[in-house]
């Protein structure tokens, strides 16, 4: 009996230990994963924004309160090495996240976990298309977008003005990075079409000119003055500071930003004849795959292109039926038809040129021809 008791005593003690301490151990395990997850996400946000003062300011008005401190108040400058380092950093974050047990996170944390993993994986896929991105597109390129972002840059304190001026000062380096990227893109045989390069270069020369800066009417001058006036009115700026900032802004626009934009225009024109493909992405080696990646990146959907196409077709058919039903209901209620083109089972025109001509004829009542308007010069 004593031997049996001695044999069962260790087993009993182990069972008792597990009953008492196992919940605490499991709780600590859950706490560890959750704490590590929060640490990883905080580090990811900080590493993503601390080198991009422009993006950071639009995301957070007071980043210091979130423990995020700028490494340098400058625009991020492209280099092949920096791009590779960024991809390596994303891979590192994804690898660390894979060690976590997402089941130990709460519902909100699991949702963030899934989103972050998908985002990092998607960003890493982009490295397969190194030179397919076009930052200088004539439709929405940085040659115009960056200046518009500067115009919308909010000033909450005088420190924001200092950061803004530092960003203007970094524009030449930023442009050099853009030209380096476009040169590498050209060497890879993926430079934009000649017509697009010419349009982008023309935009560089037109959106910022010596004449508008001399007259003080450029939008980067007028919006800057307006934002300073707002700070002055709130008592966050002195008259002396306002005058000093106005002078610095004028100097940087004339001596840094304008020459950089002229350099960008020259660089695009020099590379304009190096584009080897015409007809858009579909004609480039991995153009279709990059387009599929773009759709996934833009929509957040994991559906294939064929699946998305079918969804769109179903939606178009549903919308078309609803339009026909609305027209039928209108006719039943009023006995007439609205002043719109009749809805037929098939679109009356199929030739692209004929469709555009028909549209131009229909829009004349609401939008008169340019020749009928008085020519006026619009200053931004």
Go through each PLM region and give its residues.
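N-terminal maturation segment of proteins
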Residues: 12, 23-380
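N-terminal Sec-pathway targeting helices
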Residues: 2-19
